[in-house]
Regions:
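Rhodanese-like catalytic fold shared by cysteine-dependent sulfurtransferases
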Residues: 2-70, 85-112, 125-186
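Structural scaffold elements adjacent to functional motifs in cytosolic proteins
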Residues: 75-77
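Short, surface-exposed ligand- or partner-binding patches at beta-edge/loop junctions that are enriched
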Residues: 117
Length: 186
């Protein structure tokens, strides 16, 4: 397991505001019991926030990872170590959400295909933005991120063993996970 730490003094204050606004949208839908609408509005909000990055669907990524015709992308899991330790996509690298692009992609050529993901796509969208700004041109953010991946029963691992649950980030965002894949918050 590789964990990449943030560079000193690296903080992104707009992340909290963006998560708050996106959270309000999801909360409003949750009150109405509209889980499908939650996801629709969340994805729409994230695409509006991160207009300069490319997105990849979970089915497109699954096909890419299964393909023998093209090299697999580097998967950057942009969640906390606590979240990572519950589960992650097979072959992913754990990257601190506040890490610089240079730290997150240390040792990778600028043309390397990279796919970022987090819980729902916000933190990984910020990382994809930073990577793109640092000259990495082949970066995509996973739409729906690990929550959607898990809800679709796609492979998750912990210590190289298949697992089925995902850290819910918190009780609010965890509502986007199906009950059977939501790990208990400790």
């Amino acid at each position: 397991m590789e964990i990449i730490s943030p560079t000193r003094g690296s903080r992104f204050p707009n992340a909290r505001l963006g998560l708050f606004i996106t959270g309000l949208i999801v909360f409003a839908c949750a009150l109405l019991g509209l889980r499908g609408v939650d996801w629709f509005l969340l994805k729409k909000s994230l695409r509006h926030k991160f207009t300069k990055i490319e997105w990849i669907s979970t089915s497109e990524l699954a096909d890419w990872l299964a393909s023998k015709r093209r090299p697999a992308p580097v998967l950057l899991d942009v969640r906390t170590e606590e979240e990572w330790n519950v589960s992650h996509l097979p072959g992913a690298r754990c990257v601190d959400p506040n890490a610089s692009a240079e730290s997150a992609a240390a040792g990778l050529p600028k043309e390397t295909p990279i796919v970022t993901y987090c819980a729902v796509g916000y933190r990984s969208g910020e990382m994809a933005d930073r990577l793109r700004a640092a000259g990495f041109a082949n970066v995509r953010n996973l739409e729906g991120s690990i929550f959607q991946w898990a809800n679709e029963d796609r492979p998750l691992v912990h210590d190289d063993e298949r697992v089925s649950q995902v850290h819910p980030y918190n009780s609010f965002w965890g509502r986007l996970l199906n009950d059977d894949v939501r790990a208990p918050v400790k």
